[in-house]
């Protein structure tokens, strides 16, 4: 290699060092061409060609995709586009609901700190030049004075630097608090927390959006404001200072300014061409994080069932699969950042540094204020020190300005990442708002057109959503359904056009096979599911109380379990005391847990402390506490003994509570006056309940079931006896005669 360089240098009459430098430049240029050409070429390809190529190689079965998937694909990918600015402006209304807010105060303080740091940087740059001038002039007294000033200015400078970080964190926390408050208000309004999971399918993991996405968005906005505001101020003020200094010395600032603009423009174009789609990458990473968290929470919620089935291997594989998908996405982002940051550093550190030296040198060399050709040695020495001061000051200012421009251009990556978080947070609020207004969209699997469905199902094209045409009217007395169908969130009609009326004092027994719509009716009456057609007259929610088969045990004391969802203050406002609660527990045969668990103020994990029957009796105790006009009982005493169950129902009737009960126990029929029976095929009937006749029919049904259950065993034994005796059965002879006739 050395001999080749020597020969080449001799042939073209270059020095050996010059040839080595040119060879290094050629190698660097070749590497840059190899790195940048595929990226730029990919950008210049026609989108139509890519689309045709993708369609040509896509399998036929994959071309039939869901309409909802097509809608998602048509949405612009998160990035620096009009959709991003629109979403950011909408979120700004939440962050700054009015002019004078806590967030505005923190923002103003943060801005003052950023401006102060810029002026301090300019002052320190000038002070550095004066210190260097005193060294060149060999003035120790001046040097010591300037050095003391430099140390003194370090005190406010370090405070401002620390204040900038502190105020940035406070601003991010204020943004997060504002977003969380608004999100919680929307999430818990009009039972959105239930509907967004069970009625709508656009948010797979709302907990991820409510926690991680809001936090990352708030931090990104605050950090980006700091990373953009100060650099812009630095560029403006340092440019003004440099131009003013050059003009005062008789130098023209036009050349360096044009060079700086050209370099910045070229760098911006190259970085934009090479920049990956960080917005889409970050949004996908957040989605995979949320799904991994969802799988973990799903295992925790079903840990007992998984342990019984010994399904830990399957669940572990599922977790590993989700984690590997997340790790792959994170590695993809890291690899793209590696090459992008390498190109960014090469352009902004080395290319800009060389251009910066040229920009500093040109004004000093061409300035008439520094000419020293005809001066004596004394004035010439002064001119040298002035040049040194000017060069040092200009270099520091230029370095500060270059660093500011570098941060501005580096912020492009942060802006695209912010676009990903903005899209997820905005989409969360958008879905919450639509669900709150009764607009639901589900992502379901489309079935083939020739797929046969049972008669009761409602077939809808996936491109449409079910129109909510029903009306709900709050009344003081009675529950009336007029042509109200029971339709599941998936669009399946399980019962059509219900018509019945339950007045105060009536007690309705609801029966039917599994999946016929019994619990679904309670969801409609409670407002969880919408009324798609007809008219529903019902009391306000405070006059209706729903008790499920597995009552929810809240976090808190024993008192909180009885009065849920009221608080202790609400209980006192209603005029209840602990003695009243004791009487309620006596009526449901649950008073013993007060002494057993340590009194009303005992705080435990009640879902593990109470047995299944005790939880159900606690649910009935809540009914007696709230005293509703109507109680919706969904097999809420299936784990309670029959004698205690009967006493509780009798006490509820004595308290004037109208019962709407789903139960399979015949012992509870006598506490009801009317019957609503579903047939499981979309039909139903509503009639007055005659308990005696129904019990007689039930006994006859059970007798026939027991008799028919023994027929297969009797037939098997008869065949065995026929084989042993070698004879035919009389029944077989009769059946043969019937076939021949």
From Swiss-Prot:
Name of the protein in its database record: ATP-binding cassette sub-family D member 2
The reaction(s) this protein catalyses: a very long-chain fatty acyl-CoA + H2O = a very long-chain fatty acid + CoA + H(+); a very long-chain fatty acid(in) + ATP + H2O = a very long-chain fatty acid(out) + ADP + phosphate + H(+)
Origin species: Mus musculus (Mouse)
Distribution of this protein across tissues and organs: Strongly expressed in brain and adrenals, and weakly expressed in liver.
BP GO annotations: alpha-linolenic acid metabolic process; fatty acid beta-oxidation; fatty acid biosynthetic process; fatty acid derivative biosynthetic process; linoleic acid metabolic process; long-chain fatty acid biosynthetic process; myelin maintenance; negative regulation of cytokine production involved in inflammatory response
Domain ABC transmembrane type-1 per the UniProt entry, residue ranges: 107-399
Gene3D superfamilies: ABC transporter type 1, transmembrane domain, P-loop containing nucleotide triphosphate hydrolases
Transmembrane stretches, start-end: 107-127, 144-164, 251-271, 351-371
ABC transporter domain: residues covered: 479-705
